Amino acid sequence: MRKIFTPLACSLLIGISLTACSNENPQTTDTTFQLNSSILPTRAPQLNANGGGTFSKNDENTLLFQAPQGTLVKSFTYTYGKTYYWNELNLPSSHKELQVSGCYPTITTSTPTLFAWDVRNASVTADLLLAPPVSVTPNTTPDIRLQFNHAMHQLQIELKADGTTLQQAACSQAKLTCRNFLPIANVNLLQGAVISASGDKSSLQATGDKATFILPPQAAGNLQLQVQLSGREYTFDLATHQIAGSPITLLESGKSIKLTITVSKTSFSVTGQNIGAWESQGESNGSIIL
Protein backbone atom coordinates (compact mmCIF):
# COMPACT_ATOMS: atom_id res chain seq x y z
CA MET A 1 0.00 0.00 0.00
CA ARG A 2 1.20 3.53 -0.57
CA LYS A 3 2.00 6.18 1.95
CA ILE A 4 0.78 9.57 0.81
CA PHE A 5 2.25 12.79 2.10
CA THR A 6 -0.02 15.67 1.18
CA PRO A 7 0.45 19.23 2.49
CA LEU A 8 -2.30 20.66 4.60
CA ALA A 9 -4.37 23.20 2.81
CA CYS A 10 -6.02 23.78 -0.46
CA SER A 11 -7.09 26.66 -2.58
CA LEU A 12 -5.81 27.40 -6.04
CA LEU A 13 -6.43 30.68 -7.79
CA ILE A 14 -5.88 30.88 -11.52
CA GLY A 15 -6.08 34.01 -13.56
CA ILE A 16 -6.40 33.66 -17.31
CA SER A 17 -5.30 36.91 -18.84
CA LEU A 18 -6.55 37.71 -22.30
CA THR A 19 -4.72 40.39 -24.25
CA ALA A 20 -6.06 41.57 -27.57
CA CYS A 21 -3.63 42.40 -30.36
CA SER A 22 -4.75 45.51 -32.17
CA ASN A 23 -5.68 44.96 -35.83
CA GLU A 24 -8.25 46.68 -37.97
CA ASN A 25 -9.20 43.46 -39.77
CA PRO A 26 -11.37 41.39 -37.38
CA GLN A 27 -10.65 38.21 -39.35
CA THR A 28 -6.96 38.37 -38.47
CA THR A 29 -7.30 39.54 -34.88
CA ASP A 30 -5.74 37.07 -32.47
CA THR A 31 -6.52 37.24 -28.77
CA THR A 32 -4.18 35.43 -26.42
CA PHE A 33 -4.99 33.95 -23.07
CA GLN A 34 -2.54 32.97 -20.38
CA LEU A 35 -2.88 31.22 -17.02
CA ASN A 36 -1.17 33.07 -14.18
CA SER A 37 -1.64 30.71 -11.26
CA SER A 38 -0.80 30.48 -7.60
CA ILE A 39 -1.49 27.62 -5.24
CA LEU A 40 -2.54 28.55 -1.74
CA PRO A 41 -2.14 25.48 0.37
CA THR A 42 -2.50 22.43 -1.87
CA ARG A 43 -0.75 19.35 -3.21
CA ALA A 44 0.72 20.30 -6.53
CA PRO A 45 4.22 21.19 -7.83
CA GLN A 46 6.73 23.34 -5.94
CA LEU A 47 4.96 23.69 -2.61
CA ASN A 48 6.22 25.02 0.68
CA ALA A 49 5.65 23.34 4.04
CA ASN A 50 2.19 24.87 4.35
CA GLY A 51 1.11 23.72 0.91
CA GLY A 52 1.41 27.04 -0.87
CA GLY A 53 3.20 27.37 -4.17
CA THR A 54 2.85 27.69 -7.91
CA PHE A 55 2.56 25.58 -10.99
CA SER A 56 5.72 25.24 -13.05
CA LYS A 57 6.54 25.37 -16.72
CA ASN A 58 5.03 22.39 -18.58
CA ASP A 59 2.49 21.62 -15.83
CA GLU A 60 -0.95 21.06 -17.30
CA ASN A 61 -4.58 21.79 -16.44
CA THR A 62 -7.74 20.67 -18.18
CA LEU A 63 -10.16 23.50 -18.94
CA LEU A 64 -13.77 22.59 -19.77
CA PHE A 65 -15.68 25.15 -21.81
CA GLN A 66 -19.43 24.61 -21.58
CA ALA A 67 -22.69 26.18 -22.68
CA PRO A 68 -24.67 28.07 -20.00
CA GLN A 69 -27.07 25.12 -19.75
CA GLY A 70 -24.19 22.86 -18.72
CA THR A 71 -23.30 20.91 -21.87
CA LEU A 72 -19.64 20.46 -22.79
CA VAL A 73 -18.50 22.54 -25.77
CA LYS A 74 -14.74 22.03 -25.64
CA SER A 75 -12.18 20.32 -23.42
CA PHE A 76 -8.76 21.95 -23.62
CA THR A 77 -5.38 21.06 -22.11
CA TYR A 78 -3.46 24.15 -21.04
CA THR A 79 0.32 23.81 -20.65
CA TYR A 80 2.07 26.40 -18.51
CA GLY A 81 4.75 28.33 -20.36
CA LYS A 82 2.99 28.24 -23.74
CA THR A 83 0.97 30.97 -25.42
CA TYR A 84 -2.52 30.19 -26.72
CA TYR A 85 -5.01 32.13 -28.79
CA TRP A 86 -8.77 32.06 -28.47
CA ASN A 87 -9.13 31.10 -32.12
CA GLU A 88 -7.12 27.93 -31.48
CA LEU A 89 -10.04 26.63 -29.45
CA ASN A 90 -12.37 26.63 -32.46
CA LEU A 91 -15.33 27.46 -30.26
CA PRO A 92 -18.73 27.60 -32.01
CA SER A 93 -19.60 31.17 -32.94
CA SER A 94 -23.17 30.55 -31.78
CA HIS A 95 -22.00 30.58 -28.16
CA LYS A 96 -21.58 34.23 -27.20
CA GLU A 97 -21.18 33.37 -23.54
CA LEU A 98 -19.63 30.26 -22.02
CA GLN A 99 -18.70 28.86 -18.66
CA VAL A 100 -15.29 27.42 -17.83
CA SER A 101 -14.43 24.89 -15.14
CA GLY A 102 -11.11 23.16 -14.56
CA CYS A 103 -9.28 20.23 -13.03
CA TYR A 104 -5.74 19.27 -12.07
CA PRO A 105 -4.18 16.92 -13.04
CA THR A 106 -5.48 16.65 -16.59
CA ILE A 107 -8.43 14.34 -17.32
CA THR A 108 -9.75 13.01 -20.62
CA THR A 109 -13.25 11.55 -20.51
CA SER A 110 -16.36 11.20 -22.66
CA THR A 111 -18.58 11.53 -19.56
CA PRO A 112 -17.53 14.76 -17.82
CA THR A 113 -20.71 14.89 -15.75
CA LEU A 114 -19.96 11.49 -14.18
CA PHE A 115 -16.25 10.75 -13.98
CA ALA A 116 -14.92 8.05 -11.63
CA TRP A 117 -11.83 9.10 -9.64
CA ASP A 118 -10.33 6.08 -7.85
CA VAL A 119 -7.95 7.03 -5.02
CA ARG A 120 -6.37 3.55 -5.17
CA ASN A 121 -5.03 4.16 -8.69
CA ALA A 122 -1.26 4.02 -8.25
CA SER A 123 -0.60 5.57 -11.68
CA VAL A 124 -1.86 9.02 -10.58
CA THR A 125 -1.90 11.06 -7.41
CA ALA A 126 -4.87 10.39 -5.15
CA ASP A 127 -5.46 14.12 -4.82
CA LEU A 128 -7.67 16.01 -7.26
CA LEU A 129 -8.16 19.76 -7.67
CA LEU A 130 -11.45 21.02 -9.10
CA ALA A 131 -12.58 24.53 -10.05
CA PRO A 132 -16.30 25.32 -10.35
CA PRO A 133 -17.40 27.14 -13.52
CA VAL A 134 -17.16 30.87 -14.10
CA SER A 135 -18.75 32.84 -16.95
CA VAL A 136 -16.69 34.16 -19.86
CA THR A 137 -17.30 35.86 -23.18
CA PRO A 138 -14.80 34.60 -25.77
CA ASN A 139 -12.54 37.37 -27.14
CA THR A 140 -14.11 39.84 -24.70
CA THR A 141 -13.47 38.71 -21.14
CA PRO A 142 -10.02 40.05 -20.19
CA ASP A 143 -9.48 37.83 -17.12
CA ILE A 144 -10.77 34.41 -16.15
CA ARG A 145 -10.16 33.51 -12.53
CA LEU A 146 -10.71 29.92 -11.48
CA GLN A 147 -10.73 28.91 -7.81
CA PHE A 148 -9.32 25.39 -7.47
CA ASN A 149 -9.96 23.40 -4.29
CA HIS A 150 -9.19 19.93 -3.03
CA ALA A 151 -12.00 17.61 -4.08
CA MET A 152 -11.01 14.75 -1.78
CA HIS A 153 -10.79 14.51 2.01
CA GLN A 154 -7.49 14.28 3.87
CA LEU A 155 -7.23 12.02 6.92
CA GLN A 156 -3.94 12.40 8.80
CA ILE A 157 -2.62 10.09 11.51
CA GLU A 158 0.36 10.88 13.74
CA LEU A 159 1.75 8.74 16.56
CA LYS A 160 3.65 10.36 19.42
CA ALA A 161 5.46 8.26 22.01
CA ASP A 162 4.97 9.28 25.63
CA GLY A 163 8.77 9.46 25.98
CA THR A 164 8.77 7.50 29.23
CA THR A 165 7.54 3.98 28.58
CA LEU A 166 8.07 4.28 24.84
CA GLN A 167 10.47 6.28 22.65
CA GLN A 168 9.52 7.93 19.35
CA ALA A 169 11.83 5.64 17.35
CA ALA A 170 9.62 2.68 18.23
CA CYS A 171 6.64 4.36 16.53
CA SER A 172 8.47 4.32 13.20
CA GLN A 173 7.72 0.59 13.01
CA ALA A 174 3.96 1.04 13.38
CA LYS A 175 1.52 -0.09 10.69
CA LEU A 176 -1.37 2.31 10.18
CA THR A 177 -4.40 1.11 8.24
CA CYS A 178 -7.46 3.01 7.07
CA ARG A 179 -10.19 0.56 6.09
CA ASN A 180 -13.83 0.16 5.08
CA PHE A 181 -13.90 3.35 2.99
CA LEU A 182 -15.52 3.76 -0.43
CA PRO A 183 -12.64 4.30 -2.90
CA ILE A 184 -14.30 5.96 -5.91
CA ALA A 185 -15.34 9.60 -6.07
CA ASN A 186 -18.02 10.23 -8.69
CA VAL A 187 -17.19 13.67 -10.04
CA ASN A 188 -19.05 16.19 -12.18
CA LEU A 189 -16.15 17.96 -13.88
CA LEU A 190 -18.44 20.60 -15.38
CA GLN A 191 -19.71 21.59 -11.94
CA GLY A 192 -16.30 21.09 -10.33
CA ALA A 193 -17.79 18.98 -7.56
CA VAL A 194 -17.91 15.46 -6.13
CA ILE A 195 -21.40 13.96 -6.37
CA SER A 196 -21.00 10.76 -4.36
CA ALA A 197 -18.67 7.94 -3.33
CA SER A 198 -18.96 4.32 -4.44
CA GLY A 199 -17.10 1.03 -4.93
CA ASP A 200 -16.26 -1.95 -2.74
CA LYS A 201 -15.06 -1.15 0.76
CA SER A 202 -11.29 -0.79 0.64
CA SER A 203 -8.17 -0.34 2.76
CA LEU A 204 -4.94 1.65 2.57
CA GLN A 205 -1.91 0.97 4.74
CA ALA A 206 1.20 2.93 5.68
CA THR A 207 4.25 2.20 7.82
CA GLY A 208 5.71 4.75 10.20
CA ASP A 209 4.63 7.24 12.83
CA LYS A 210 2.79 9.44 10.31
CA ALA A 211 0.41 8.73 7.46
CA THR A 212 -1.94 10.70 5.25
CA PHE A 213 -4.86 9.01 3.54
CA ILE A 214 -6.62 10.81 0.69
CA LEU A 215 -10.23 9.59 0.53
CA PRO A 216 -13.39 10.45 -1.41
CA PRO A 217 -15.83 12.61 0.60
CA GLN A 218 -18.28 10.22 2.30
CA ALA A 219 -20.13 9.37 5.47
CA ALA A 220 -17.84 8.25 8.28
CA GLY A 221 -20.07 5.18 8.55
CA ASN A 222 -18.05 2.01 9.06
CA LEU A 223 -14.66 3.61 8.40
CA GLN A 224 -12.03 2.25 10.78
CA LEU A 225 -8.44 3.04 11.73
CA GLN A 226 -6.08 0.32 12.89
CA VAL A 227 -2.75 0.78 14.70
CA GLN A 228 -0.32 -2.16 14.89
CA LEU A 229 2.74 -1.65 17.08
CA SER A 230 5.06 -3.87 19.13
CA GLY A 231 3.06 -6.98 18.36
CA ARG A 232 -0.24 -5.45 19.45
CA GLU A 233 -3.05 -3.80 17.57
CA TYR A 234 -6.00 -1.55 18.19
CA THR A 235 -8.89 -0.81 15.85
CA PHE A 236 -11.39 1.98 16.39
CA ASP A 237 -14.37 3.38 14.52
CA LEU A 238 -13.83 6.92 13.31
CA ALA A 239 -17.51 7.72 13.88
CA THR A 240 -17.17 7.08 17.63
CA HIS A 241 -14.86 10.07 18.04
CA GLN A 242 -15.98 13.65 18.38
CA ILE A 243 -15.02 17.07 17.12
CA ALA A 244 -16.06 19.98 19.32
CA GLY A 245 -18.50 17.70 21.12
CA SER A 246 -20.14 16.30 17.99
CA PRO A 247 -19.56 12.84 16.47
CA ILE A 248 -17.62 12.62 13.21
CA THR A 249 -20.36 11.79 10.70
CA LEU A 250 -18.91 12.99 7.40
CA LEU A 251 -15.53 13.26 5.67
CA GLU A 252 -15.99 16.55 3.85
CA SER A 253 -14.58 17.58 0.49
CA GLY A 254 -11.57 19.88 0.74
CA LYS A 255 -11.18 19.35 4.48
CA SER A 256 -8.69 17.53 6.67
CA ILE A 257 -8.98 15.67 9.97
CA LYS A 258 -5.82 15.03 11.96
CA LEU A 259 -5.65 12.40 14.68
CA THR A 260 -2.67 12.81 16.99
CA ILE A 261 -2.31 9.62 19.04
CA THR A 262 -0.10 9.53 22.12
CA VAL A 263 1.27 6.02 22.59
CA SER A 264 2.67 4.27 25.66
CA LYS A 265 3.38 0.61 26.30
CA THR A 266 -0.07 0.24 27.80
CA SER A 267 -2.26 2.60 25.82
CA PHE A 268 -2.94 4.94 22.95
CA SER A 269 -4.38 8.32 23.85
CA VAL A 270 -5.96 10.28 21.01
CA THR A 271 -4.96 13.76 22.11
CA GLY A 272 -5.63 15.66 18.90
CA GLN A 273 -8.24 15.20 16.24
CA ASN A 274 -7.98 18.40 14.46
CA ILE A 275 -8.81 19.79 11.12
CA GLY A 276 -5.80 21.14 9.38
CA ALA A 277 -5.26 23.74 6.78
CA TRP A 278 -6.92 22.27 3.73
CA GLU A 279 -9.85 23.66 5.64
CA SER A 280 -10.48 22.75 9.23
CA GLN A 281 -13.09 20.16 10.03
CA GLY A 282 -12.21 19.31 13.62
CA GLU A 283 -10.19 17.76 16.44
CA SER A 284 -11.10 14.88 18.75
CA ASN A 285 -9.87 13.22 21.93
CA GLY A 286 -9.98 9.68 23.27
CA SER A 287 -7.88 6.73 24.34
CA ILE A 288 -7.20 3.20 23.15
CA ILE A 289 -5.57 0.40 25.11
CA LEU A 290 -3.22 -2.12 23.54
Roles of regions detected by a PLM:
Residues T111-W117, E233-Q242:
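Edge beta-strands of extracellular beta-sandwich domains
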Residues S172-I184:
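Short, surface-exposed alpha-helix to beta-strand junction/turn motifs within ectodomains of secreted
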Residues Q69-T77, Q167, L182-L190, S196, ...:
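Surface-exposed loop/edge segments in extracytoplasmic proteins
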Residues K82-E88, V194-D200, Q242-K258:
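Short, surface-exposed linear segments at secondary-structure transitions and domain or protein termini
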Residues M1-A9:
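Bacterial N-terminal signal peptides that target proteins for export
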Residues S17-A20:
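C-terminal motif of bacterial Sec signal peptides marking the signal peptidase cleavage site
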Residues N23-A170, T177, D200-K201, Q205-A211, ...:
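Short, low-hydrophobicity acidic/polar segments
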Residues Q242-L290:
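Hydrophilic extracytoplasmic domains
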